[in-house]
């Protein structure tokens, strides 16, 4: 923790001064953050509410405004249409509102939930009644598509309706059902916190209750279902939103059952139990989602058997397997560094972490989703420790490998984010070297949308009688400390173009409070001023 102390500058503040410095019953959780650690027993830093912070001007305010005016609306139109694929229409078909067949990737449901999460996060800042009405219309259809037992996956439901005997719940890991439901749970929590409504939260709870029953005693076959494990983060967040311990137990089960898989793979991080892992392997999105989920479980349980591999894997990534952009996953395709048991076969990996220092520039994969997963993971590591080194990685990824995934006009996207683009290559790579409005695998664009919509949530944190300033950008904060005292701050800066940051304390209670300022890794040793 020494680095945490070195990389934060603390000041005390007290008014009157100006400080210039660089159908269901649920507890009311509206106003809390995207990852709500307000009551997490092992969180050193508490998140602030979605409605307590907003961008005001500058770099991030411009991108948030673009998300509001262009990215969310244009993507909403794409997902409600059928020109490229089917997203919302699959829900309408599953609900029996229109006739048709399922079309699109098996993870389209989850990607639609990501867009819904991003649109919901915008509501915390805009209170746009038209957007809220539109989301409620969509949520009503999602609810109608859900089976009475809580199961919700449009691809499986539509295929089962026409007699497909292979369309059964949790039969095929490549149906991505848990991934889809994980994003449903997260979207539901954000929607509830942004609006105070429980319509989507009720849908998510019914789905989670089905998962609790189904995975109460997981078999090796069920354990293989955990591909792109967003469901761990989702289940923990649902526990935080509802206070129901069974959802935390479910998240712990999702982690533990990975040790049940027979003939597991590095590609899916289930060759050995998570608690025995020491380095990042396999599909980088799946890996980073797993690490973020494990960090979420640690925040609630304090289990040292989770923290030990998290620290070891983190060190392996940032010192040997991460690009200077914060990008993760260097390989398009390859063989597992750990080899295969059968000498006549290989253990393939793709979109994956490679060997130590295997970081090609031109053929870098660095999928946008993996890079967002890196930020999600490091954010949770920071919340658990208060160590600035984790926020350094969040900032590194957000400014570079995450934002590069979208165009300046908010309508076109990258799937991969190479560090070098060669005009001539001996072979054509899988993904376009130019941004496009749509990819057959459409996971990255809505992930970027929700990340930008929720970006202000990373700026500040709280702990007892202190405010943490984690990121720099023109913003305003209006929150309360543990003793109930109100704190209002305004941050003015042209960061990252200019390193001068001015923080004004607009209001606070009668008691002094701490103000913890992260010293960016590139800025150590510079002089700070107080005025």
Language-model-detected regions and their locations in the chain:
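N-terminal secretory signal peptides that target proteins for export/translocation
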Residues: 1-13
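Generic structural signal for short, solvent-exposed loop/turn connectors between secondary structure elements
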Residues: 4, 25, 217-221
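Sequence-pattern detector for short linear motifs
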Residues: 8-9, 17, 117, 289
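Generic N-terminal simple sequence motifs
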Residues: 11-12, 23, 69, 516
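Hydrophobic alpha-helical segments and their boundary regions
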Residues: 12-14, 40-41
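Bacterial N-terminal signal peptides
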Residues: 14-27
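Glycan-recognition and catalytic cores of secretory/periplasmic carbohydrate-active enzymes
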Residues: 31-531
């Amino acid at each position: 923790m020494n680095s945490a102390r070195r990389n934060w500058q603390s000041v005390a503040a007290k008014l009157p001064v100006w400080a210039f410095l660089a159908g269901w019953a649920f507890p009311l959780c509206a106003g809390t953050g995207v990852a709500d650690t307000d009551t997490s027993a092992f969180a050193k830093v508490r998140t602030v509410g979605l409605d307590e912070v907003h961008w005001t001007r500058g770099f991030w305010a411009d991108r948030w405004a673009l998300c509001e005016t262009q990215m969310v609306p244009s993507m909403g139109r794409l997902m409600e249409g059928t020109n490229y694929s089917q997203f919302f229409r699959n829900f309408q078909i599953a609900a029996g509102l229109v006739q048709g067949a399922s079309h699109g990737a098996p993870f389209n449901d989850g990607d639609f939930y990501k867009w819904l999460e991003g649109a919901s996060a915008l509501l915390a800042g805009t209170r746009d009644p038209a957007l809220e009405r539109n989301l409620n219309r969509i949520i009503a259809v999602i609810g109608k598509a859900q089976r009475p037992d809580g199961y919700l996956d449009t691809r499986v439901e539509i295929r089962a309706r026409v007699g497909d005997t292979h369309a059964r719940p949790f039969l095929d890991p490549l149906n991505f059902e848990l991934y889809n439901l994980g994003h449903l749970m997260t979207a539901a929590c954000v929607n509830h916190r942004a609006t105070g409504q429980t319509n989507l939260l009720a849908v998510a709870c019914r789905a989670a209750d089905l998962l609790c029953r189904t995975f109460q005693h997981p078999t090796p076959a069920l354990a293989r279902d955990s591909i792109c494990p967003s469901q761990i983060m989702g289940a923990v967040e649902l526990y935080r939103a509802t206070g129901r311990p069974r959802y935390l137990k479910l998240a712990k089960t999702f982690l533990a059952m990975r040790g049940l898989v027979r003939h597991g793979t590095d590609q899916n991080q289930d060759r050995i139990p998570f608690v025995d892992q020491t380095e990042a392997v396999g599909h980088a999105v799946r890996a980073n989602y797993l690490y973020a989920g494990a960090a979420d479980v640690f925040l609630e349980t304090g289990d040292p058997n989770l923290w030990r591999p998290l620290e070891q894997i983190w060190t392996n990534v940032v010192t040997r397997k991460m690009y200077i952009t914060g990008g993760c996953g260097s390989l398009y395709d390859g063989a597992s560094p750990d080899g295969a048991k059968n000498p006549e076969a290989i253990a393939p990996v793709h979109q994956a972490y490679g060997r130590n220092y295997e970081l090609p520039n031109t053929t870098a994969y660095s999928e946008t989703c993996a890079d967002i997963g890196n930020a999600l993971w490091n954010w949770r590591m920071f919340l658990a420790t208060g160590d600035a080194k984790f926020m350094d990685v969040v900032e590194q990824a957000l400014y570079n490998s995450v934002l590069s995934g979208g165009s300046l006009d908010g309508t076109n996207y990258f799937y991969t984010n190479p560090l070098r683009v060669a005009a001539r290559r001996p072979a054509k790579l899988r993904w376009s070297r130019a941004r496009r409005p749509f990819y057959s695998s459409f996971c990255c664009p809505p992930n970027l949308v929700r990340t930008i919509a929720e970006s202000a949530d990373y700026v500040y944190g709280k702990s007892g009688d202190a405010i943490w300033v984690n990121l720099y950008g023109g913003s305003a904060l209006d929150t309360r400390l543990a003793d109930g005292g109100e704190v209002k701050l305004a941050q003015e800066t042209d960061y990252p173009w200019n390193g001068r940051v001015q923080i004004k304390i607009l209001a606070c209670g009668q008691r002094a409070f701490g103000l913890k300022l992260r010293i960016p890794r590139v800025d150590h040793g510079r002089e700070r001023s107080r005025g």
